[in-house]
Amino acid sequence: MRLCDRDIEIWLDEGRLDIAPRPPIERINGATVDVRLGNQFRVFRGHTAAYIDLSGPKDEVTAALDRVMSDEIQLVEGEAFFLHPGELALAVTLESVTLPDDLVGWLDGRSSLARLGLMVHVTAHRIDPGWQGRIVLEFYNSGKLPLALRPGMLIGALSFEPLSGPAARPYNRREDAKYRNQQGAVASRIDKD
């Protein structure tokens, strides 16, 4: 059963759930907390690689990822990031989220943005128990027009679901946690699998 707005407020007040900066009451709705777009992005740069063999030798996968992913792009206040039709880009939420070991989170995009063709997460919308950091957004523009995305705009909503008990292997205590405490638009670390 997912937390309702009253329970989200209680969990925030008690420090069991942390969202920084803490959202105002107007952004806690029914069963979700609205999150905003941060100012860090990462895109695929122009490349000549025919493909990336995701099951190939780790050093080859790492080299291929280094060739195709851009450095992190950091926007200054007032700037827009333009996501063109058919493009994939990574970004982060403005808010940093810390989940306890007995709570899982879910990220959903906004319906109003989806109706313009913007996918906020391509597949990864679960936020594991024990997570700490900013949430990476996997943007895809399936629409017909470029979309101007500005830091601070409402971009999605988080919901939270208590588990039957604390996780034995919460995310931030796992040795194989590839995105532990991420603060920026971290590129794929598939080569660390």
Curated annotation (Swiss-Prot):
Its pathway? Pyrimidine metabolism; dUMP biosynthesis; dUMP from dCTP (dUTP route): step 1/2
> What Gene3D superfamilies does the record tag this protein with?
2.70.40.10
What is its EC class? hydrolase
* EC number assigned by the record: 3.5.4.13
Q: What's its job?
A: Catalyzes the deamination of dCTP to dUTP.
Spell out the family assignment given in the record's similarity comment: Belongs to the dCTP deaminase family.
Q: What is this protein called?
A: dCTP deaminase
Name the encoding gene, please.
Answer: dcd
